[in-house]
Amino acid sequence: MASTPRIVIIGAGIVGTNLADELVTRGWNNITVLDQGPLNMPGGSTSHAPGLVFQTNPSKTMASFAKYTVEKLLSLTEDGVSCFNQVGGLEVATTETRLADLKRKLGYAAAWGIEGRLLSPAECQELYPLLDGENILGGLHVPSDGLASAARAVQLLIKRTESAGVTYRGSTTVTGIEQSGGRVTGVQTADGVIPADIVVSCAGFWGAKIGAMIGMAVPLLPLAHQYVKTTPVPAQQGRNDQPNGARLPILRHQDQDLYYREHGDRYGIGSYAHRPMPVDVDTLGAYAPETVSEHHMPSRLDFTLEDFLPAWEATKQLLPALADSEIEDGFNGIFSFTPDGGPLLGESKELDGFYVAEAVWVTHSAGVAKAMAELLTTGRSETDLGECDITRFEDVQLTPEYVSETSQQNFVEIYDVLHPLQPRLSPRNLRVSPFHARHKELGAFFLEAGGWERPYWFEANAALLKEMPAEWLPPARDAWSGMFSSPIAAAEAWKTRTAVAMYDMTPLKRLEVSGPGALKLLQELTTADLAKKPGAVTYTLLLDHAGGVRSDITVARLSEDTFQLGANGNIDTAYFERAARHQTQSGSATDWVQVRDTTGGTCCIGLWGPLARDLVSKVSDDDFTNDGLKYFRAKNVVIGGIPVTAMRLSYVGELGWELYTSADNGQRLWDALWQAGQPFGVIAAGRAAFSSLRLEKGYRSWGTDMTTEHDPFEAGLGFAVKMAKESFIGKGALEGRTEEASARRLRCLTIDDGRSIVLGKEPVFYKEQAVGYVTSAAYGYTVAKPIAYSYLPGTVSVGDSVDIEYFGRRITATVTEDPLYDPKMTRLRG
C-alpha cells in the first residue's frame, strides 16, 4: 500500500474515531488517534451523550451532516445490531407559535430531502400514548430520526480501524504541538513526540486548550447541561426488554426546553431550562484515566437538583405517567457551544496542516467526519462548509468575553423560535462605521452581522411614504415576514431609483493585495483575467478545484503592484493570506506578496441613483462623466477636499460609485455629500432597500445564492469565467460545462399573487415534487411583486409554474427571465 500523510487525530470520541474510519475508507493508512482517557471510555462528551438525533435543521449543511450520521450508524453493526435505533422523532407544540414553527420546520425537511409530516393532537397521542393530549396542539414526526449508540459506535469504529492499521493510544495526554517553517510537524506527549504531517484536533470541549498550543483562538465555551434518569415508570413496564431499549420515538418539548428518550422502563430527560453553567476546564483537575467510569468522568459534573425542579414539573404535565416515578440520578454534562451555534471545522490560519473539528455533537458526528476526510484527502468537502469554517469569525468575535456571552446566549435560546433576522441584544456596537452618529440622527434601525452595526432603514424617511406614487407601496406582510422589516424600505428604494441615495457599505470586507507577486497570486486564484491596466475593476470568482464557487469578489487594480479586493468576510481573508504565504515562501523575490485587511481603517459610501452625478459634481472638480470614469473603472478623486478612491460600480442597478476613504475622513465625506445632495433630495438608505434592489437586478449573494456546492454556470455566473485564461484554480473541472447543459440552474421566481413574501430556505415544488429551495427572497419594490431565487432542474423552463411552501401553505410562482430590472444595463451605464 502506498504511503499516505502521517495523520494524528487528537480525541477518540465519536468525531475522532469516525474521522479515522472515513480516512481509512479513502485509502489513507498512516493514522494515530490519541486520547487522554482510556479508549473504552474516554470521558468526553461522547461518553455521556444520550444519543438523540433529530435531523431537521434550518441549515442545509447541518441537516446533511445529520442524514449521513444516521446512514452510517445504521450500517455500523455487530451481531446483527446496528448503532442506531430508528424509532423516529416527535416534536410537539403546546403554543401556537411553536405549532407554526413546526410547519416551517417541515418545510426545511422537505427542502433537505427528509421525510416528515405534521400530526394532529390525536395522532401525536396515538404515536406516543404517554402524552397528555389536552395540552398538545400538534407535532412534527420524522420517521428516520432516532437514537445513536455513540459509545458503542466508538468501540466498533476503533475495532474496525485498528484492523485496517490505525494506531490508538489511550491515556495519552497531549502537551504541545511541534512545528517548523509555519507547518505542523508533530504532537508532543508525555511519552515523546509523534511525527505528523497533519494534525486534527477532535478534542471536544478541550479543543480551546489544544488550539492555544499553537496560539490559535478556538471560539467554544464548555457549558453544563442537565440530564436525568427516572425510577421505573409503571406505564413502561414490559415495553422494552433491554436496559437502554426504546420503542417510542425520541421526544422534544421545545416550548419547555426539554427532550426525552426511553431507557428500558425508565425515562431519560434532558433539560436546557436552567441557567447557563459555563465550565472552566482548568478547574476539572488532573485527568486520572484509571478513575474513569460510567458515573465518574471529566465531562460529567455533580447534579444540581434545584436547577432541574422546574423541568421536572413541566415533564409531569406533558407526560402524566411520570408522576408515578421519581428522579433516580442525574448529572450536569459538559457540551461545547460556540458564538453562532455552529461547529468549528477546517484548517487553522495560524499553522499549516493543523485542523480542527470541534463543537460537534453526536447528531452531526459522522457527517462532519466525512466532510473533514474529504477536505483532507481532496482539498474540498462535497458539503459546503462556509457556515462551519473555523476562520469565519472576525477578530472581535474571538475574544474570551465575546465567546462567553454569545455562547451562553445560544444555550439559553437553543430551542427558541428565532427569526432569520433576529438581532442579538448583546453584545452590540462592537464595530461601527464613521457614519454611525449620522445614522443615529436619522433614526436608523440597526441589525448586526460580523460585529458590525448595519442600518436596515431610517425612520427619517417615513414621511416619504406619503410622497411616493401609490404603485410603490408594498403589500401588507404577514406577522413573520413583517418582523424586522418596514415599508420605509420601499420609500428608500423609490428614492434610489428616482433621485439619489447614500448607502453605508463600510462593513463589507476590504483587502489590499500588494507586492511584485500580487498579480501572479490573483491570476491563479480568480476566474477573470486581471492583467489589465491600473484603474480596472473586475468582478470575478474564487473556485475550489472541483469548480465550486468558494466566493465572489471585486478586484480593483490601483497600481501595477497594488489591488483592492471587495471580499466576503474572514474566510476570504484567511484564504488569501494562506495563498500569499505559500507563494512568498516557495517563490523568488519577485513572487513576494502581502495581504492586509483594510476594512477597519477605511470606509465606503455607495452613492447611487440617476442624480448621483449631479450631486457629486457639486463637491468635486474631477471628471465623473462616462468618459471620465467608465463603468467598472476606478480612480483617485477629491470630494469636498477629501481624498477618495471612486469605483464605478453598483449593486442596486443605478448610476453611481463606491466611494472609499480613510476612516478618519469618513464623517467629513458623509457630511459633504449630504449637504451637497439636499437640492437633489438625497436620502440615507439601508440594507432592506439594498437587498430588494439587488434581487431586481439579478445580482447573486455568495453563501446563499451560490456556495462550493454550485458551479458558476449553475449559478448563472458563467460570464465571470474566462476559460481562455491560461490557468486558474478550478479551470479543469469546468471544461465542457455550460449554463444550458447544467442539470440545475439558479432561477428567478416571481410570486403570482403579488403579495406573498417568503424569506429563504422554503422548499420549492414542481409537479408536486420538492426540487429545490429558496436561496434569496425579497419584495421587489420597483417591479411591484415578490421575488425569490431557487436552484431548479434544468428541465424547468421560463414560464413554468412552481409552488413555494411557506408555513404549510403553497404559494404559486412563475419562473422568469432575469434580471427583472434594466436587463440592457442602460441605467448603470447612464
Swiss-Prot record:
Listed EC numbers: 1.5.3.10
InterPro entries the record matches: FAD-dep_OxRdtase, FAD/NAD-bd_sf, FAO_M, GCST_C, GCV_T_N, GcvT/YgfZ/DmdA, GcvT/YgfZ_C, TrmE/GcvT_dom1
The reaction(s) this protein catalyses: N,N-dimethylglycine + O2 + H2O = sarcosine + formaldehyde + H2O2; N,N-dimethylglycine + (6S)-5,6,7,8-tetrahydrofolate + O2 = sarcosine + (6R)-5,10-methylene-5,6,7,8-tetrahydrofolate + H2O2
Keyword Flavoprotein: yes
Active-site residues, Swiss-Prot/TrEMBL: H225, Y259, D552
Positions annotated to bind FAD: 14-15, 35-36, 45-48, 52, 174, 259, 360-363
Gene3D superfamilies according to UniProt: Aminomethyltransferase beta-barrel domains, D-Amino Acid Oxidase, subunit A, domain 2, FAD/NAD(P)-binding domain, Probable tRNA modification gtpase trme, domain 1
Residues the record lists as binding (6S)-5,6,7,8-tetrahydrofolate: Y539, T554, G566, E658, L659, Y660
GO molecular function, one term: nucleotide binding
Necessary cofactors: FAD
Variant or mutagenesis effect after changing H225Q: Reduces catalytic efficiency 3-fold and substrate affinity 30-fold
Outcome of substituting Y259F: Reduces catalytic efficiency 225-fold and substrate affinity 25-fold
Keywords: FAD, Flavoprotein, Nucleotide-binding, Oxidoreductase
Main enzyme class: oxidoreductase
Residue(s) carrying Pros-8alpha-FAD histidine: H48
Entry note: cofactor: Binds 1 FAD per subunit.
pH dependence: Optimum pH is 8.0-10.0.
Site (Important for catalytic activity): H225, Y259, D552
PANTHER family, sorted: AMINOMETHYLTRANSFERASE (PTHR43757), SARCOSINE DEHYDROGENASE (PTHR43757:SF11)
Known function: Catalyzes the oxidative demethylation of N,N-dimethylglycine to yield sarcosine, formaldehyde and hydrogen peroxide. The oxidation of dimethylglycine is coupled to the synthesis of 5,10-methylenetetrahydrofolate through an unusual substrate channeling mechanism. This channeling occurs by nonbiased diffusion of the iminium intermediate through a large solvent cavity connecting active site 1 (N-terminus) and active site 2 (C-terminus).
Family under the similarity heading: Belongs to the GcvT family.
Protein name: Dimethylglycine oxidase
Source species of the chain: Arthrobacter globiformis
